Amino acid sequence: MKIHKCSFCGADIPPGYGIMYVRSDGTVQRFCSRKCFVSAVKYGRNPRKLAWVRKKKAKTSK
């Protein structure tokens, strides 16, 4: 099974978990949590400007 990366925060998503979102142009985005999904799709936030994303990326990169 393939482990995917979250399109918003970059966290690993194990098989069977997360949200898969397909845009109208056919682009597939995968999210590890509803928090990432809503931040990206509903609010259109930039992950580089959010402190919790930077902390999560630093934690997963170790």
Curated annotation (Swiss-Prot):
<keyword id="KW-0694">RNA-binding</keyword>
<dbReference type="InterPro" id="IPR055345">
    <property type="entry name" value="Ribosomal_eL24-rel_arc"/>
</dbReference>
<dbReference type="GO" id="GO:1990904">
    <property type="term" value="C:ribonucleoprotein complex"/>
</dbReference>
<dbReference type="GO" id="GO:0005840">
    <property type="term" value="C:ribosome"/>
</dbReference>
<protein>
    <recommendedName>
        <fullName>Large ribosomal subunit protein eL24</fullName>
    </recommendedName>
</protein>
<feature type="zinc finger region" description="C4-type">
    <location>
        <begin position="6"/>
        <end position="36"/>
    </location>
</feature>
<dbReference type="GO" id="GO:0003735">
    <property type="term" value="F:structural constituent of ribosome"/>
</dbReference>
<feature type="binding site">
    <location>
        <position position="9"/>
    </location>
    <ligand>
        <name>Zn(2+)</name>
    </ligand>
</feature>
<feature type="binding site">
    <location>
        <position position="6"/>
    </location>
    <ligand>
        <name>Zn(2+)</name>
    </ligand>
</feature>
<comment type="similarity">
    <text>Belongs to the eukaryotic ribosomal protein eL24 family.</text>
</comment>
<keyword id="KW-0689">Ribosomal protein</keyword>
<dbReference type="InterPro" id="IPR056366">
    <property type="entry name" value="Ribosomal_eL24"/>
</dbReference>
<keyword id="KW-0479">Metal-binding</keyword>
<dbReference type="GO" id="GO:0008270">
    <property type="term" value="F:zinc ion binding"/>
</dbReference>
<comment type="subunit">
    <text>Part of the 50S ribosomal subunit. Forms a cluster with proteins L3 and L14.</text>
</comment>
<dbReference type="Pfam" id="PF01246">
    <property type="entry name" value="Ribosomal_L24e"/>
</dbReference>
<keyword id="KW-0863">Zinc-finger</keyword>
<dbReference type="InterPro" id="IPR023442">
    <property type="entry name" value="Ribosomal_eL24_CS"/>
</dbReference>
<dbReference type="GO" id="GO:0019843">
    <property type="term" value="F:rRNA binding"/>
</dbReference>
<dbReference type="InterPro" id="IPR000988">
    <property type="entry name" value="Ribosomal_eL24-rel_N"/>
</dbReference>
<comment type="function">
    <text>Binds to the 23S rRNA.</text>
</comment>
<keyword id="KW-0699">rRNA-binding</keyword>
<keyword id="KW-0687">Ribonucleoprotein</keyword>
<feature type="binding site">
    <location>
        <position position="32"/>
    </location>
    <ligand>
        <name>Zn(2+)</name>
    </ligand>
</feature>
<keyword id="KW-0862">Zinc</keyword>
<dbReference type="InterPro" id="IPR038630">
    <property type="entry name" value="L24e/L24_sf"/>
</dbReference>
<dbReference type="InterPro" id="IPR011017">
    <property type="entry name" value="TRASH_dom"/>
</dbReference>
<feature type="binding site">
    <location>
        <position position="36"/>
    </location>
    <ligand>
        <name>Zn(2+)</name>
    </ligand>
</feature>
<dbReference type="GO" id="GO:0006412">
    <property type="term" value="P:translation"/>
</dbReference>
